[in-house]
Amino acid sequence: MARHARRAEGRRRRITGFAAAGALTALLGGAALTGAAFADDGHWNHTDGTPCSKHARACVDLAHNQAWLIHDGEVTRGPVGISHGGQGKETPTGDFEVQWKDKDHRSAEFNDAPMPYSVFFADGGIAFHEGNPQNPSAGCVHLGHDDAVAWYADLEVGDEVEIH
């Protein structure tokens, strides 16, 4: 009986060992596939000097009050100083697309306030536009005049915007 118990225990060890080896192989193989997926997706490869992927056309770093324009993974303008939403009116973070543009937009929400060179990218009227980069906004990304003109000229409807 003791001999039979030892053989059964040996089989269990071999089976457990094979199962562990198989699980490890599957895990490592999955990691390799996952890595390839990230690389193909582009969100793994960031544009140098920015927190954004090479697919982004406009990139914003809220923590450092900076923004960039990017084309084919290369910075074409920036970093430039910006301001963004203040407390309770934060600029949304995430991946967005340019929805529409209006060179002479006026705010329906804030007493017809001018929002020149507006490039809208998020629900709720959130846009890049000319504004004082020293003052917080109601959620938009304020750019100085020359930068607002450049953002307006460079970005097209459907372009990817990343806000970090």
PLM features: what roles do these ranges have?
Residues 2-88, 92-95, 100:
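Cell wall/extracellular polymer interaction/catalysis modules
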Residues 3-5, 22, 40-43, 50-55, ...:
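Exported/periplasmic cell-wall-interacting domains
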